[in-house]
Regions:
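Helix-to-loop junction immediately C-terminal to a conserved catalytic motif
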Residues: 47
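Conserved ABC transporter NBD signature motif
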Residues: 54-68
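Conserved ABC ATPase "signature" region
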Residues: 90, 100-117
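Conserved ABC ATPase signature
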Residues: 121-125
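Catalytic Walker B motif of ABC-type/P-loop ATPase nucleotide-binding domains
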Residues: 146-150, 155
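ABC transporter nucleotide-binding domain
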Residues: 162-244
């Protein structure tokens, strides 16, 4: 178990994190929040790239986490441009003293469809290909904790699905923390969800618990059935749903279970980034 206790961090007068505490075990943890909520600050502290003003990050009974125990894919991954994709994976494997290094490399090359790029220099790769390579690097050496900051940035829809399926499988044996603006990337695979706002946990718990925080069911309505008075509204939850329910034609609306995006919008509002 990786335990984060009372982490705080300020940048001059701006409080980025305020008393963040959470325990991370095997499974997928989605950290959601608008820009400036403290997500990247938290991840940089957990990886040792940034010093907290206060608090601790410990493993097990209280020891510090060795570098080989975690993998990290930053939002803007840095790589050696003159290395080939294969050499980058090999280099990370050596640093982590990975067992069966060559087998791991070949496995990730296949999973992330890097075969045609493995002998090409990193500096010549596209942004999406570099991103897939960065995710593969994070899992080299079978770390106990993997931290992914906006891992699907620059990936096309099919690649995002591939990454999502990979994470779902890896989450059975690894603690994975994913920070993302793309809610659909973690919905249905996250075991726990943490919503951050201004450096504090606004909502946290299992996915089922978080989804239950929305007041009741949701209404959906196709555009052709929405009256001009509600132009642009396609999904309503809780109290909002009850207000307009009697104004929608019965055949044009239906009850559905809330989704993670509904919870996000109920916590942060329509004006925040998703």
């Amino acid at each position: 178990m990786i335990s984060v206790k009372n982490i705080s961090k300020s940048y001059k007068s701006v409080r980025a994190l305020s008393g963040f505490s959470y325990d991370f075990e095997r499974g997928i943890y989605a950290i959601l929040g608008p820009n400036g909520s403290g997500k990247s600050t938290l991840m940089n502290i957990m990886t040792g790239n940034l010093k907290a003003d206060g608090g601790t990050v410990t493993v097990g009974e209280g020891g510090e986490m060795p570098d080989y125990m975690f993998g990290y894919c930053p939002q803007y991954p840095g790589m050696y441009p003159n290395f080939t994709a294969y050499e980058m994976l090999d280099y990370i494997g050596i640093l982590k003293n990975a067992e069966n290094r060559e087998k791991q490399i070949e496995r990730f090359i296949e999973i992330f469809e890097l075969g045609e790029y493995k002998n090409k220099r990193v500096g010549a790769l596209s942004g999406g290909t570099k991103q897939r390579l960065a995710i593969a690097q994070a899992f080299m050496g079978a770390p106990e904790l993997v931290i992914l900051d906006e891992p699907t940035a620059g990936l096309d829809p099919l690649q995002r699905i591939n990454v999502k399926n990979f994470l779902a499988e890896q989450g059975k044996k690894t603690a994975i923390i994913v920070s993302t603006h793309i809610v659909s990337d973690v919905e249905n695979i996250a075991h726990e969800v943490i919503m951050l706002k201004k450096g504090k946990i606004t909502l946290g718990g299992s996915l089922a618990d978080v989804l239950s925080r929305v007041d009741g069911k949701c209404f959906t309505a196709s555009a052709e059935h929405i009256s001009q008075n509600f132009e642009g509204i396609y999904r309503l939850c809780g109290a909002d749903m009850r207000i307009v329910a009697d104004k929608l034609p019965f055949e044009g609306a239906k009850l559905v279970s809330p989704e993670l995006e509904d919870v996000y919008l109920s916590v942060f509002g329509m004006g925040d980034d998703i």
